[in-house]
Regions:
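Short, glycine-biased loop/turn motifs at secondary-structure junctions and
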Residues: 1-170
Length: 170
């Protein structure tokens, strides 16, 4: 079975354990496939924003690649944190590395939930931030996420709650 998705890497296409990967190459594991931090296999996600759970893209530059799983696949879902369609495979091909501009443009037309998860985990530069604020200026959910996660406005949700309480009493 083939399944396409995304995999995040440290700069230089290395994983969290220091293993280097190359575009166009296929990698296989030995031993039984198992999802998790102490697992065995190559993790990837169906949606790009879910890869940000595994790499600190708010603090450091990362690379995100399109990948294809070519072997056995194990699926994992974390309903508590709303992470779905995360996978682990015993055989993966690194198809290509996405350019930053591609990543930014991918989320200019996604639903609120996906955009909010993206801005929660991927540090936008000032020009990208201005673009997102322009595109989503009438979308209070996305604008609040931008204010909180990108601009560090830790009171944005409290202000919104106070406004709602005031409106209910009038």
């Amino acid at each position: 079975m083939e399944l396409h998705g995304y995999k995040a890497f440290n700069k230089g296409l290395t994983n969290r354990y220091g293993k280097e990967f190359k575009v166009g190459e296929t990698y296989e594991i030995s031993g039984p496939l198992k999802f998790g931090n102490n697992g065995n296999g190559f993790h990837f996600c169906e949606r790009l924003e879910d890869t940000l759970r595994y790499f600190p893209a708010m603090e450091e530059e990362i690379e995100i690649a399109e990948v294809t799983a070519l072997g056995d696949i194990e699926e994992f879902e974390d309903e508590y944190y709303c992470y779905y369609d995360m996978y682990c495979t015993d055989k993966i091909r690194i198809d290509r590395v996405l350019e930053r501009k591609e990543i930014i443009e991918m989320f200019l037309d996604k639903n609120n939930f996906r955009v909010m998860r993206f801005v929660q985990g991927f540090k936008l530069n000032p020009n990208e931030l201005d673009l997102y604020k322009l595109i989503y200026e009438s979308n209070i959910c996305v604008m609040n996420a931008i204010a909180y996660y990108q601009e560090g406005d830790k009171e944005v949700y409290n202000r919104r709650a106070k406004l709602r309480r005031l409106r209910k009493t009038n």
